[in-house]
Amino acid sequence: MCIRDRGNRIELVYKPHTDNSPFVSGRPISGFKTDVCGLGHAVLHVSNVDMLIPFYRDILDFKISDYSFDPISLCFFHVNGRHHSFALIGSGQQGFHHFMVEYKNLDDVGQGYDLLQYNHKNGIAYTLGRHTNDYMTSFYAHTPSGFFIENGWGGRIIDPTKWVPHETNEGPSFWGHERLYLPDDERLKFRKKRIETAQKGKRSPMIIDCPWLYQNIKKKYEIEKIQEEEDLEDIL
C-alpha cells in the first residue's frame, strides 16, 4: 500500500519475501549490524518538518528521538532500539536524502572511505565524521541517483520504553562530515557549529553500545512479533 506525506510517496509493507541465500559483499567486510534494529535508517527531504510530524508520530506511530532547528530543521524517529530509523530534513525539497547502513567493524568504514577516494575522484559527499545524536562514525557517498549512502559504525542503542524526546543544539556532528557538495557559504554554517561544539567540550560517551540492552530489546521485539502474528491469525 502506498500513501503520501504531502509530497513523498511512502510504501507500507508487511512480511516481504526474503532470500534465503546469504549476502555476499563485493569486498571483504565483517558484516552489517541489522537484526532487530533493521537495515539502518532512511532520511527524506521535506518542505516543512513541523507539518509532517503528526503523520509519522500519530498515524504511523513512529516515536520521536530528538529534533533540532540549527543550522537546519531536523526530526529523528525510532521504531526499535536503534536511535533513529527514520528522519526528516527541512531542506525545502522533496525526495530521498540518504539511507544508512551500519558496519560491524570500524575498519570496514575506513577502508571503504579509502577505496571510494582512490576509485572515484568526487565520490565523497560528506567526509568522515561523528554525529552528535546517535554517535555514528560515518562518511556519505554520492550515488548516480542523486541521493547519498551513509556508511557508518558505532551507532547508539536506546531503550525505547525510557527514552524522552528532546531538542538538540550541538549541530549534527561533533567533528568531520564536511559537506563537500555544498557551496562554501553553506558549508561554513555547519563548520561554525562544529567548532562551537568542540569549544564546549561536547563528545560522545566512551561506551556507545550495550550488549545487555541490545539483547533485551531483541527479546522484547521477538515476543511482540510472535504476539502480532497470533493476533493476525485470530483476525483471519
Indicate where each model-derived feature is located.
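Short beta->alpha transition motifs characteristic of CBS
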Residues: 12-18, 152-157
